[in-house]
């Protein structure tokens, strides 16, 4: 049989025949599924590409259920050396197990963020560790103070062999937390190495009035010490950071006011912030984590300066996971530079990386698998 014509409201519509060669088949890989390695769920993706081209994906391993800390949670890592086609057996960069007389379910560590020091290829992972606190949500049961019995701890691990093995946990709480804050943790996803070698992670903290605020922390000495300055915007949480030009950082934030992303700029590592023209206007969101990366002109096949963004492209519900591109520094995100990957409902978190000069990689919480990976050609997004 053959389709001869199509009528819409009584009028004949123009039909264009397409060859099978014109159809783009974009396959996805289920990196983590419920039940893998005995874990009930996997959440909170982070993704980077090492200097050697290795893909390193991090996430929460939530053994008992999908709920947030406090629970039995470790930071897991999956490693791919073939562009995301296959993934090695899961590693655990951060895992406390039974500690200080309390079971693993009272020593959860999660919401990871991962960073590649591009000058040394040292890989850093930062996460929140909660000791005790019953089984209440750590967001509300962490308190002011500094020691592990009162407040969540900010811990790191590093790898110097391309993500194969990891150091013991490094506790940096004393370096960056204000004792009056209830909770300090990273912005899940990824951090960056600036053009001058400074390492930067996004952060979020609940202040003394119980209001959450996004910001950054940074290291000038290859990760030995870390500093924080001021918040970027009040009532914001999970954020991602990029360097849009030398010394200029953009922070893209989940905003509890709902509806759209907040965006701020700093030229002094977070001492002062200014609102970006796109803030609360250009990028809609359902109040959810999102991903943002900067791809310099010399680092991509199009020879253009590009910002890439991904999130659930909606204001209600976590669905329609979409990658968007901006060619003007994030001022506009044109419809022709958007690609929807998954219209189904899921948890909605995602993280982007460049696999090579031609290909975007995304690890996200899809409607089909807890951790789903897809590779997307840059030219499919920006034609």
What kind of region is each of these model predictions?
Residues 2-11:
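Exposed low-complexity, polar/acidic, P/S/T/G-rich flexible segments that act as propeptides
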Residues 15-383:
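Asp-box/BNR beta-propeller blade signature and adjacent active/binding-site loops
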């Amino acid at each position: 049989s053959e389709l001869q014509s199509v009528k819409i409201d009584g009028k004949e519509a123009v039909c264009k025949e397409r060859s099978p060669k014109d159809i783009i088949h974009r396959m996805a890989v289920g990196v983590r599924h419920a039940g893998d390695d005995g874990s009930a769920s996997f959440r909170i993706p982070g993704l980077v590409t090492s200097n050697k081209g290795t893909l390193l994906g991090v996430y929460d391993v939530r053994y008992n259920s999908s709920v947030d800390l406090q629970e039995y949670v470790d930071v897991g890592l999956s490693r791919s050396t073939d562009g995301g086609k296959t993934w090695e057996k899961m590693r655990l960069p951060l895992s406390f197990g039974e500690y200080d007389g309390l079971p693993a379910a009272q020593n959860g560590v999660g919401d990871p963020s991962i960073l590649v020091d591009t000058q040394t290829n040292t890989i850093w992972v930062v996460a929140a560790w909660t000791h005790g606190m019953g089984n209440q949500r750590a967001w509300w049961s962490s308190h002011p103070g500094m020691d592990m019995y009162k407040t969540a701890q900010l811990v790191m691990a590093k790898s110097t062999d391309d993500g194969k093995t990891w150091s013991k946990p490094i506790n940096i709480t004393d370096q960056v937390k204000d004792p009056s804050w209830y909770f300090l943790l990273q912005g899940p996803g990824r951090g960056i190495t600036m053009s001058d070698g400074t390492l930067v992670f996004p952060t979020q903290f609940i202040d003394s009035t119980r209001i959450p605020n996004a910001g950054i922390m940074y290291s000038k000495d290859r990760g030995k010490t870390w500093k924080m300055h001021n918040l970027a915007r009040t009532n914001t949480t999970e954020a991602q950071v990029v360097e849009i030009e030398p010394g200029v950082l953009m922070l893209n934030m989940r905003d509890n006011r709902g509806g759209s992303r907040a965006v701020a700029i700093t030229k002094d590592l977070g001492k002062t912030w200014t609102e970006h023209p796109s803030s609360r206007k250009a990028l809609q969101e359902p109040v959810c984590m999102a991903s943002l990366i900067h791809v310099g002109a010399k680092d991509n096949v199009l020879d253009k300066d590009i910002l890439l963004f991904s999130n659930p492209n909606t204001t209600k519900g976590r669905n329609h996971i979409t990658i968007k591109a901006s060619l003007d520094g994030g001022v506009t995100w044109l419809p022709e530079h958007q690609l929807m990957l998954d219209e189904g409902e899921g948890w909605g978190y995602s993280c982007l990386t460049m696999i090579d000069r031609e290909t975007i990689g995304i690890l996200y919480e899809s409607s089909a698998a807890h951790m789903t990976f897809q590779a997307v050609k840059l030219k499919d997004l920006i034609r």
